[in-house]
């Protein structure tokens, strides 16, 4: 070809590092056309200068080292690398690689090798044939059930189930209420609410001329032009006939609170005389723009304080009122059901379980779980010991280091302010605190007043109602447990919980001096605190509740296992493990070559000068191994002791449960769940299922005749579960269900229903969650993990795990009794002694050492690797 003369190698055309003999075979004319596949100047420096000048648009690749890389296929270039490069030799196909550090031992066919793994490898355990693994997912995992393109599943419901309509994503559902409910209308954002008043009230226009009123009317003040109307995003509700309306004021209005009849008011800013109303309407005097008018009211009037423009009023309702909750714009409503319906929550339901159930809470993605333990387990605290308390103990939550605690006081305690000193008053005095500018004032009311909430509407319920706390949208619900449950806190590290106080505690708040004062209240008034939007409330629990400690985000919890669980220890990086052997094993040191001897010969190995010899012992000797200085040993325990393993920092423990536990996995927010099916359903897995049709077909499971398929929806669809006939519905986002008149409401943020003891809850998930089907006990699921996922398994009580080791661990294999290997070792090897056939190693360890499990000789370890993992010789 026209480039052949240019490409022909010439000795004088190469730079100094070139070794001409390497190129000698090319001088024979072979059927090689270099220009067909290789640009002649690629990667070279001076070899093909004439052609490089022709290829004007070609820019030769500059490298950090002078690599000649572009030779014909038969040429194996010798690369020059930077000083830090550690070359890995390449061998012909028949080459049997010799390890660079530790020899590769050949074993008889019955030897079951224990592989070594890279540091990032998370082993997948092997289980008995009847084991049903519970799957966990990494935070980024988004499993989605795969259906054939034409699959239109139909959900199956119990006979009494009333189907829920599915709505577009922008649909805002309106719950149904009992007959006594007086609806609070919702308005568009631009709606200017006109409050409804009792029958005797004569409304007054806001800006139009004031009409004349009956003699009993006390005028509503007029405001200067700078008045900012009370925002109308929250509609003003309608009130019962006995309600006395509260006027709204401009933002700069300084409220003068109303006091009980015995209170002698001290004026706060400017004393305002009260006016006696004449039978005819008296015009309101006009004041300068900065005047803060205080209206006068009839004696029975209950004053309504002024609020900042951002204040969201909470209406008060009669005792039988069933509140209609307000929802964020993204709320996907769940319809309300008849009282006998037991709904399955779809967002953050956390059911209660029978007293024997140890719940596995769901946590934020960064949370490292702290396991729950069986009742007989005596926990060794891993972060901060949380003592157990008598049933009447009110738990004091644990906080991150940066938390500034607000102490709780006994009922008679008079708080000492933390900002400005406040004088002490007689016991009947109710102080009027000062607040920072951003504070949303809360009015004081007579004892019979029904408060209007200041953050999100919280209806009032009869005295028997048990309130459900409300949470911000980003809150991950904490389950409620039976009294015997020892809970774990799942707060993020930045969480500042709010303490709860005894009912009689009167907190005295201190605020910045610029605060617009908050009125004082009659003794029987229980003020409701208002919180900024970012406030994360702390739930108060019944007296028998055992609080869950909260840990920083970096905390790695240590799981506990059922009493029969045999722990899998973890070792420090420098630990040289000593494997456990079958009773008849003839151990072999793995340092210096040991010749083969007659079968009765017990070899005494030879060691390097630095070796601390470990002798061989008679059969009855219980050896005490020695460990490197950094080794953290674990003491030996009686045979009945169930060890609790410790794990390296990167270990994400999987909690294991008693055999009867039906686990419900917790998922990250982005998890797409698989639908659940009736117990008789034989599901076909939905992630890596082998198709039965052409490759584009996603296997469609076969169902029993009674199965009503659950549809697959577009990505934006928020699935609604099917429920048993007696299920009580739980709202999906911020829905407030309707209750019987005896029901005590919980706050409106995230409802947490309680269920009968036999109820197996289906966890609720974020809106993007696609449900995963639950299968009957005999179902053998196929893994649905991405290739990079390394699951952590739980084990049945009788499972003996196979050990995994840190990267630097040098495992020593175990052999059948008749095997006498002969090995040569590098000079730095640490020898392991050999023992007589009946040797039972009784190891005494330092306190933190985690015992290594020995397995029966019939145990066959099966190690599975992720698809991309190529195990390398790490010796």
UniProtKB/Swiss-Prot annotation:
Residues 93-139, 166-218, 425-466, 474-518, 526-537, 600-642, 741-763, 777-807 have a biased composition (Low complexity). The modification 3',4'-dihydroxyphenylalanine is found at residues 91, 95, 117, 121, 147, 151, 157, 161, 177, 181, 187, 191, 197, 201, 213, 217, 223, 227, 239, 243, 249, 253, 259, 263, 287, 291, 297, 301, 307, 311, 317, 321, 327, 331, 337, 341, 353, 357, 363, 367, 373, 377, 389, 393, 399, 403, 409, 413, 425, 429, 435, 439, 445, 449, 461, 465, 471, 475, 481, 485, 521, 525, 541, 545, 551, 555, 561, 565, 571, 575, 581, 585, 597, 601, 607, 611, 617, 621, 627, 631, 637, 641, 647, 651, 657, 661, 667, 671, 677, 681, 703, 707, 713, 717, 723, 727, 739, 743, 755, 759, 765, 769, 775, 779, 815, 819, 835, 839, 865, 869. InterPro entries: Adhesive_plaq. Provides adhesiveness to the mussel's foot. Mussels produce one of the strongest water insoluble glues. The mussel's adhesive is a bundle of threads, called a byssus, formed by a fibrous collagenous core coated with adhesive proteins. The modification (3R,4S)-3,4-dihydroxyproline is found at residues 92, 118, 148, 158, 178, 188, 198, 214, 224, 240, 250, 260, 288, 298, 308, 318, 328, 338, 354, 364, 374, 390, 400, 410, 426, 436, 446, 462, 472, 482, 522, 542, 552, 562, 572, 582, 598, 608, 618, 628, 638, 648, 658, 668, 678, 704, 714, 724, 740, 756, 766, 776, 816, 836, 866. This is Adhesive plaque matrix protein. Produced by the byssal gland. Residues 75-868 are annotated as: 85 X 10 AA tandem repeats of Y-[KN]-[PALKTS]-K-[LPMIKST]-[ST]-[YN]-[PK]-[PAS]-[STA]. Almost exclusively composed of repeats of a decapeptide. The keyword Transferase does not apply.
């Amino acid at each position: 070809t026209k480039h052949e003369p240019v490409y022909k190698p010439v000795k004088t055309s190469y730079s100094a590092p070139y070794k001409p003999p390497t190129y000698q075979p090319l001088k024979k004319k072979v059927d090689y056309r270099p220009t067909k596949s290789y640009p002649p100047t690629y990667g070279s420096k001076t070899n093909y200068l004439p052609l490089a000048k022709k290829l004007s648009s070609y820019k030769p690749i500059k490298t950090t080292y002078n690599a000649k890389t572009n030779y014909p296929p038969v040429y194996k270039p010798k690369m020059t690398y930077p000083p830090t490069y550690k070359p890995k030799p390449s061998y012909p196909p028949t080459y049997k690689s010799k390890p660079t550090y530790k020899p590769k031992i050949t074993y008889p066919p019955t030897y079951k090798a224990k592989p070594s793994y890279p540091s990032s490898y998370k082993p997948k355990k092997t289980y008995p044939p009847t084991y049903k693994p519970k799957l966990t997912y990494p935070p980024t995992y988004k499993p989605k059930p795969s259906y054939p393109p034409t699959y239109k599943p139909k959900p199956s419901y119990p006979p009494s189930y009333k189907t829920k309509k599915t709505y577009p994503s922008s649909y805002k559902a309106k719950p149904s209420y009992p007959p006594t409910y007086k609806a609070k209308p919702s308005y568009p954002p631009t709606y200017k609410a006109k409050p409804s008043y009792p029958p005797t009230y004569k409304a007054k226009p806001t800006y139009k001329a004031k009409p004349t009123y009956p003699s009993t009317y006390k005028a509503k003040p007029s405001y200067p032009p700078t008045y900012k109307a009370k925002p109308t995003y929250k509609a003003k509700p309608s009130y019962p006939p006995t309600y006395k309306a509260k006027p709204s004021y401009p933002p700069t209005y300084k409220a003068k609170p109303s006091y009980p009849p015995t209170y002698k008011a001290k004026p706060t800013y400017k004393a305002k005389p009260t006016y006696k109303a004449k039978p005819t309407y008296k015009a309101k005097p006009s004041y300068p723009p900065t005047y803060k008018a205080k209206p006068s009211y009839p004696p029975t009037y209950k004053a309504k304080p002024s609020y900042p423009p951002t204040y969201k009023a909470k209406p008060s309702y009669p005792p039988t009122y069933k509140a209609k909750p307000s929802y964020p714009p993204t709320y996907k409503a769940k319809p309300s059901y008849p009282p006998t319906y037991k709904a399955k929550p779809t967002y953050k339901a956390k059911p209660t379980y029978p007293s024997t159930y140890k719940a596995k809470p769901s946590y934020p993605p960064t949370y490292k779980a702290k396991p729950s333990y069986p009742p007989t387990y005596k926990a060794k605290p891993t972060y901060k010991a949380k003592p157990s308390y008598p049933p009447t103990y009110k738990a004091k939550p644990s906080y991150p280091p940066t938390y500034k605690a607000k102490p709780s006081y006994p009922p008679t305690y008079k708080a000492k302010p933390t900002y400005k000193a406040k004088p002490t008053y007689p016991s009947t005095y109710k102080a009027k605190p000062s607040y920072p500018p951003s504070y949303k004032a809360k009015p004081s009311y007579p004892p019979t007043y029904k408060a209007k909430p200041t953050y999100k509407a919280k209806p009032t319920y009869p005295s028997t109602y048990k309130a459900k706390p409300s949470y911000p949208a980003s809150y991950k619900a904490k389950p409620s447990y039976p009294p015997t449950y020892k809970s774990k806190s799942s707060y993020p590290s930045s969480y500042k919980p709010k303490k709860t106080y005894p009912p009689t505690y009167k907190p005295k708040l201190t605020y910045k001096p610029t605060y617009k004062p908050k009125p004082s209240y009659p003794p029987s008034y229980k003020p409701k605190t208002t919180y900024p939007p970012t406030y994360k409330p702390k739930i108060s629990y019944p007296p028998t509740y055992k609080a869950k400690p909260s840990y920083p985000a970096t905390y790695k919890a240590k799981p506990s296992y059922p009493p029969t669980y045999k722990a899998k220890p973890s070792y420090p990086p420098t630990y040289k493990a000593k494997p456990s052997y079958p009773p008849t094993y003839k151990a072999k040191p793995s340092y210096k070559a040991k010749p083969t001897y007659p079968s009765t010969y017990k070899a005494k190995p030879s060691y390097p000068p630095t070796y601390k010899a470990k002798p061989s012992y008679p059969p009855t000797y219980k050896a005490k191994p020695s460990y490197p200085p950094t080794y953290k040993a674990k003491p030996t325990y009686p045979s009945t002791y169930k060890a609790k393993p410790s794990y390296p920092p990167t270990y994400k423990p999987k909690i294991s449960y008693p055999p009867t536990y039906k686990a419900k996995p917790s998922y990250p927010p982005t998890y797409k769940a698989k639908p659940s099916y009736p117990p008789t359903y034989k599901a076909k897995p939905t992630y890596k299922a082998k198709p039965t049709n052409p490759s584009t077909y996603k296997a469609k499971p076969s169902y029993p005749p009674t199965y009503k398929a659950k549809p697959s929806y577009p990505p934006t669809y928020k699935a609604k579960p099917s429920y048993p006939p007696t299920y009580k519905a739980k709202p999906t986002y911020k829905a407030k269900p309707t209750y019987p008149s005896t029901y005590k409401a919980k706050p409106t943020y995230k409802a947490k229903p309680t269920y009968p003891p036999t109820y197996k809850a289906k966890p609720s998930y974020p809106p993007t969650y696609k449900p995963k089907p639950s299968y009957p006990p005999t179902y053998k699921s196929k893994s649905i993990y991405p290739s990079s996922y390394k699951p952590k398994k739980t084990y049945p009580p009788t499972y003996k795990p196979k050990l995994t080791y840190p990267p630097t661990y040098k495992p020593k294999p175990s052999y059948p009794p008749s095997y006498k290997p002969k090995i040569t070792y590098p000079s730095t090897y640490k020898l392991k002694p050999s023992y007589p056939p009946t040797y039972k190693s009784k190891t005494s360890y330092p306190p933190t050492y985690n015992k290594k499990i020995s397995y029966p000789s019939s145990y066959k370890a099966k190690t599975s690797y992720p698809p991309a993992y190529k195990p390398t010789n790490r010796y």
